[in-house]
Structures are given as structure tokens and as C-alpha cells.
Amino acid sequence: MDYRKYHAGYGTESTFADMLRDKSVSEGDIKSWQSGLPDFATEKADVRAKLVEWQTSWMKDYGVDYFRVDTVKHVDSTTWAALKNSTTEVNPSFKMIGEYYGAGYASNGSTLGTGQMDADLDFDFNDQATSFVSGNISSVESFLSSRNAALNNAYMTGQFLSSHDEDGFKASLM
């Protein structure tokens, strides 16, 4: 399941008023409204607990067995660890792959190997794939060897080529 944990969606301020951050406060990636969307105050224990309860109920009610987590850097690490702990209580093999924009195997926003995410999307892979089809096979092989040496069962990446947020992989080849 693809989801965002940090905001409630446009037009939902009155529904979730007691769970949202103050719109006038702007404190970096975690404590600011992003793109004008009402932001859950995930650093508050009661808000965190309610969100985790909702998300684990999706697992129980609908058989969700993994989350592809959007915009990981907009939620505090305590919340990610709480969600991961709760999901593995329901299903020990539950997995979460995070989208931490700009992350790669060498720079992942400290979400891997910390009990938060099982994997992050590897944004460096896009450049490597472009380099590969451009004929730079040796440099890509070197990158992949280094990346593979760094990965293990608690520190994994998923190949990332493009998304709705940027030009597609094929566009970079034209």
C-alpha cells in the first residue's frame, strides 16, 4: 500500500483539528505544513498512537502486507519506529520501503538499520541506469559493487527510476 503518514489531505482541517500542527509554525521538514496540506503532529504521543492504530487496522482488515511510505523525512523517527514495531507485532514479515528524497545506499536519512524502514528507495540508481545505457558500464559496475557490499537484511534499497515528482527515466535519455 502506498501512503503518506504526515498529512490529512486538503479540506480535512475540521475533521482532524485536534491532531494537526499549528499551521503558522514552520520548523523544517518535520514540523511544517508541506504544500499547504494539514500536517499531523506525529511527535505527539496521542496522535502517533492513533495513526499507528489506524494503519495496523488496515493490515488486519484488508491484509496489507507492506507499505511504500511517501516522504519519510516529514515524520519523526520515533513515529516510524513505533509504526514498524506495531506492524511486526501484527505480521512479523511486514515490510516498509521509504521514499526519502535524495537517499541512496550511502546516504539514507538514518532510516535504515534503526528499526524504522526495511528499505529506502535508491535515488542514485536513476543516474546509474542512465550512465549504464550511455555506455559507462565499468563505472556502474563499480557503484553496484560498492552498494551491494553495504547492503544486508536490515539495510536494503529499492531501485528508483522516476516518479510523478520528476521527469521520467526515459526523458533523461532523449
Where would I find each of the regions flagged by the language model?
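Substrate-binding/active-site clefts of carbohydrate-active enzymes
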Residues: 1-62, 82-98, 106-107, 130-131
